[in-house]
């Protein structure tokens, strides 16, 4: 099953690369193998031309790669998602312009999206009248410290679809490739709408 997910993830990485959502080898993607292991893209690889050989097996509990090769810098964010959400089987971390800029414009720790029909692309959302909260965390080069802050936040407030890193990008996930990809595309559309709304509304 996970082998099929990995093959689907490679196709999704090519789609992400074609969209320009992981420029200059940025971003990282992973699939869960089981409760112990995940497969994560290797550091410094162009996402538009990845193959299955560019993914490393990583232990979820320790962030260690038995192969000795270097996994992506944000490995600890992927393994955190797998520990926090047993239903998550795919994690996508992208560096889109909309996510990067909007996370800097919004000064609070939550981006509240409301009034958009496309909110319904997110799992569990049924109305444009609902408010979709997307947590924003200050960026940190110490990924262990960043992961600890996110874990503390998740103890008291829900992280349902993904989160933003300020001036950095978006991390989102899903139970399978289809859900993760839909939520990435949906959130990216909503971020673009919100940026345009803030530009044009007085």
UniProtKB/Swiss-Prot annotation:
EC number: 4.2.1.109
Gene Ontology annotations for the cellular component aspect, listed alphabetically: cytosol
KW Lyase (keyword) present: yes
Known catalytic reactions: 5-(methylsulfanyl)-D-ribulose 1-phosphate = 5-methylsulfanyl-2,3-dioxopentyl phosphate + H2O
Chain sites annotated for binding Zn(2+): 93, 95
HAMAP family: Salvage_MtnB
Similarity section: Belongs to the aldolase class II family. MtnB subfamily.
Protein name: Methylthioribulose-1-phosphate dehydratase
Organism, scientific name: Klebsiella pneumoniae (strain 342)
Encoding gene (name): mtnB
């Amino acid at each position: 099953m996970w082998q099929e997910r990995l093959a689907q993830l490679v196709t999704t990485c090519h789609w992400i690369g074609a969209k320009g959502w992981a420029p200059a080898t940025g971003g990282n993607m992973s699939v869960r193998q089981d409760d112990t292991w995940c497969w994560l893209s290797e550091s410094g690889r162009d996402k538009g031309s990845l193959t299955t050989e560019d993914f490393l097996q990583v232990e979820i509990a320790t962030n260690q790669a038995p192969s000795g090769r270097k996994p992506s810098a944000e490995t600890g964010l992927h393994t955190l998602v797998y520990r926090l959400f047993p239903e998550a089987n795919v994690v996508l971390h992208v560096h889109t312009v909309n996510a990067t800029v909007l996370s800097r414009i919004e000064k609070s720790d939550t981006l509240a999206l409301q009034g958009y029909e496309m909110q319904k692309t997110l799992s569990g959302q049924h109305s444009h009248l609902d408010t979709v909260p997307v947590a924003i965390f200050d960026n940190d080069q110490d990924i262990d410290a960043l992961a600890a802050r996110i874990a503390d936040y998740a103890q008291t407030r829900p992280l349902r679809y993904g989160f933003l890193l300020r001036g950095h990008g978006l991390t989102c996930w899903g139970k399978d490739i289809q859900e993760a990809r839909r939520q990435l595309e949906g959130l990216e559309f909503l971020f673009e709408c919100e940026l345009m709304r803030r530009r044009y509304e007085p």
